[in-house]
Curated annotation (Swiss-Prot):
<keyword id="KW-0132">Cell division</keyword>
<dbReference type="Pfam" id="PF00275">
    <property type="entry name" value="EPSP_synthase"/>
</dbReference>
<feature type="active site" description="Proton donor">
    <location>
        <position position="115"/>
    </location>
</feature>
<dbReference type="GO" id="GO:0008760">
    <property type="term" value="F:UDP-N-acetylglucosamine 1-carboxyvinyltransferase activity"/>
</dbReference>
<dbReference type="GO" id="GO:0051301">
    <property type="term" value="P:cell division"/>
</dbReference>
<dbReference type="GO" id="GO:0008360">
    <property type="term" value="P:regulation of cell shape"/>
</dbReference>
<dbReference type="GO" id="GO:0071555">
    <property type="term" value="P:cell wall organization"/>
</dbReference>
<comment type="function">
    <text>Cell wall formation. Adds enolpyruvyl to UDP-N-acetylglucosamine.</text>
</comment>
<feature type="binding site">
    <location>
        <position position="305"/>
    </location>
    <ligand>
        <name>UDP-N-acetyl-alpha-D-glucosamine</name>
    </ligand>
</feature>
<keyword id="KW-0131">Cell cycle</keyword>
<dbReference type="InterPro" id="IPR001986">
    <property type="entry name" value="Enolpyruvate_Tfrase_dom"/>
</dbReference>
<keyword id="KW-0573">Peptidoglycan synthesis</keyword>
<feature type="binding site">
    <location>
        <begin position="22"/>
        <end position="23"/>
    </location>
    <ligand>
        <name>phosphoenolpyruvate</name>
    </ligand>
</feature>
<comment type="pathway">
    <text>Cell wall biogenesis; peptidoglycan biosynthesis.</text>
</comment>
<dbReference type="GO" id="GO:0009252">
    <property type="term" value="P:peptidoglycan biosynthetic process"/>
</dbReference>
<keyword id="KW-0963">Cytoplasm</keyword>
<dbReference type="GO" id="GO:0005737">
    <property type="term" value="C:cytoplasm"/>
</dbReference>
């Protein structure tokens, strides 16, 4: 199992180029199952979850190849089951279900795996598809969906805001008869990107980015070329790298207007932030950040995927900051690892109270999930001595070449293969 060895402390400064957003690329790749003609998807990050998705699509009969862009041809799909072997590593595979039942009248997906951060039930996906007329059975660890003829448009009020279920319902509804309205829909930029992709193929979706999405069903979707939006979480992670180390970081090929809540908190922490159309810069002028308090919330609130990075920021900041996690359970698993490096914090249910310390010391630590692992690597960059971060397969699921980008900012980091 690979590890990172990080020598600190380092002031992280320089430029990084932001990759395409994993959280948009994944639903877009699955939504390509709806297309009867070839699609080209640009700016897809090179990540483990993307590779797994392409393997899964290939098993369903999609012609999938990568040559700069990702090229998918789902015109000859002849298998409608996403098997356990591939699904077990990645929760996103549930997104195959809606397109399969919408286009082919049947689909089955093994109950999924992925990061171990609390309950992420597939119930909302299932009830949404049932409201569109699908019959759902849970058998032998598989979710099986079927419909006679086509799905039927419906007025769906979601019990709670869910990015995953919004994607499932929106994708499936593109080929339903009649009009579907999703109330209490998720508003994330990645939802907007998925809708824009589907519209490029001939779907009729309006309102994405608001809490009410309307989908007028069409007979078929064709092909097209689409570019995935930049990764706002990767952008935020590298900005935090600059903030905790007193550095100056410029993120190129970014989309700052998807990051309002994060940029506001970085300014509150004392950072000087500048933005352009496709870049954002942070300058700490050598200062320590000030602690900030925040609550995670669905977009446009503060993203849960930036919570671990801001926990780290608070733990090395001046003062005390309180972070409340409202989206997922078990999302403070990085905190005991940071405590091994000298961080002071208390966890009270869904709240983390961070008491900033002037410096961290190196330690051997273990990644527990994707964003937690990023915070541990950044902690190693600013800690005194050599930090070893174990189980970095988590980080490879969501960050493209993170060590190369950190090296470009001046980090002293190397990947050690499990054998060494």
């Amino acid at each position: 199992m690979d590890k990172f060895r990080v020598q600190g402390p380092t002031r992280l400064s320089g430029e990084v180029t932001i990759s395409g957003a994993k959280n948009a690329a994944l639903p877009i790749l699955f939504a390509a199952l709806l297309a009867e003609e070839p699609v080209e998807i640009q700016n897809v990050p090179k990540l483990k979850d993307i590779d797994t998705t392409m393997k899964l699509l290939s098993q369903l009969g999609v012609k999938a190849e990568r040559n700069g862009s990702v090229y998918l041809d789902a015109s000859k799909v002849d298998i409608y089951c996403a098997p356990y072997e591939l699904v077990k590593t990645m929760r996103a595979s549930i997104w195959a279900l809606g397109p399969l039942v919408a286009r082919f009248g049947q689909g089955q997906v093994s109950l999924p795996g992925g990061c171990a951060i609390g309950a992420r039930p597939v119930d909302l996906h299932i009830t949404g598809l049932e409201q569109l007329g699908a019959e759902i059975k849970l058998e032998e660890g598989y979710v099986k969906a079927s419909v006679d003829g086509r799905l039927k448009g419906a007025h769906i009020v979601m019990d709670k805001v869910s990015v995953g279920a919004t994607v499932t319902i929106m994708s499936a509804a593109t080929l339903a008869t009649g009009t579907t309205v999703i109330e209490n829909a998720a508003r994330e930029p990645e939802i907007v990107d998925t809708a824009n992709f589907l519209n490029t193929l001939g779907a009729k979706i309006s309102g994405a980015g608001s809490d009410r999405i309307t989908i007028e069903g069409v007979e078929r979707l064709g092909g097209g070329v689409y570019r995935v939006l930049p990764d706002r979480i990767e952008t935020g992670t590298f900005l935090v790298a600059g903030a905790i180390s007193g550095g100056k970081v410029i993120c190129r090929a970014a989309q700052p207007d998807t990051l309002d809540a994060v940029l506001a908190k970085l300014r509150e922490a004392g950072a000087e932030i500048e933005v352009g159309d496709d870049w954002v810069s942070l300058d700490m002028h050598g200062k320590r950040p000030k602690a900030v308090s925040l609550r995670t919330a669905p977009h446009p609130g503060f993203p849960t995927d930036m919570q671990a990075q801001f926990s780290l920021l608070n733990l090395v900041a001046e003062g005390t900051g309180v972070i409340t996690e409202t989206i997922f359970e078990n999302r403070f698993m990085h905190v005991p690892e940071l405590a091994r490096m000298g961080a002071h914090a208390e966890i009270e249910s869904h709240t983390l109270i961070c008491h900033g310390v002037e410096k961290l010391s190196s330690a051997q630590v273990m990644a527990t999930d994707l964003r937690a692992s990023a915070s541990l690597v950044l902690a190693g960059c600013i800690a005194e001595g050599v930090t070893v971060v174990d189980r970095i397969y988590h980080i490879d699921r969501g960050y493209e070449h993170i060590e190369d980008k950190l090296i470009a900012l001046g980090a002293n980091i190397q990947r050690i293969s499990g054998e060494e």
